[in-house]
A protein has these predicted regions:
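Active-site loop segments of alpha/beta catalytic cores
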Residues: 1-204
Length: 204
């Protein structure tokens, strides 16, 4: 849906209404968009990057799981397969609620997913995600960008970081990070505390 909302002046709600009114148009768009995305991926992969990043904002998860499976998953599958064949790692970024998306991603060759936001911004329980999907893909993120990083104390950051490591660090495959970006006014002390905690406790 993210590729299409510009046709509706950036209004995702209008785009979704239009889909239900004219599904045949969106199906044609989806076919063209998939070809474009796969071609772009082929060009990027030819440059031998260290990593190919997929996704964007939370539009994958603002749509229903049915729409995500119909319009997003096929392209993700093809691009991840191409990257795997080229020996390039892949990461998918999708803000917001992502539990339903994570289940779909197990059908792909994706290497890593982020930001795995906890409630209220997302719906991820990190320990549960590690149990369910930790052997299939690497996990990145989960520290709350607002209540912990922006508004919390350094002690709060250390506690949350240690918990994330405990929840998802066993046997590796976890990148300690914030759940999405740090807000503009995030205290520097909190950022440095996150780095220090990762260096101190992040050996797993």
């Amino acid at each position: 849906m993210q590729m299409w909302i510009d046709f509706f002046e950036g209004n995702l709600e209008s785009a979704i209404y239009a889909y239900y009114d004219h599904p045949e148009i969106f199906e044609e768009w989806a076919e063209l968009a998939e070809k474009l995305l796969v071609k772009q991926a082929e060009i990027y992969l030819s440059l031998k990057p260290d990593l190919l990043l997929l996704g964007g904002s939370g539009t994958i998860t603002l749509a229903s799981p049915e729409l995500a499976r119909k319009f997003a998953l096929p392209a993700i599958k093809k691009i991840c397969r191409l990257a795997k064949e080229a020996g390039i790692l892949t990461m998918l970024h999708s803000c917001g609620k992502s539990m339903a998306l994570l289940e779909m991603l197990t059908e792909t060759d994706l290497n890593c997913v982020n930001p795995l936001e906890e409630p209220p911004m997302g719906d991820v329980n990190l320990a549960e995600v590690k149990r369910l999907y930790g052997k299939k893909m690497s996990l990145m993120g989960n520290l709350n960008t607002t209540s912990v990083m922006l508004k919390g104390s350094a002690a709060d950051v250390e506690e949350a970081a240690k918990k994330a490591i405990d929840d998802a660090g066993k046997d590796g495959g976890f990148l300690l990070s914030t759940g999405d970006q740090c807000g503009r006014d995030t205290p520097e002390e909190n950022i440095f505390t996150l780095v220090k905690t990762a260096k101190t406790y992040g050996k797993y």
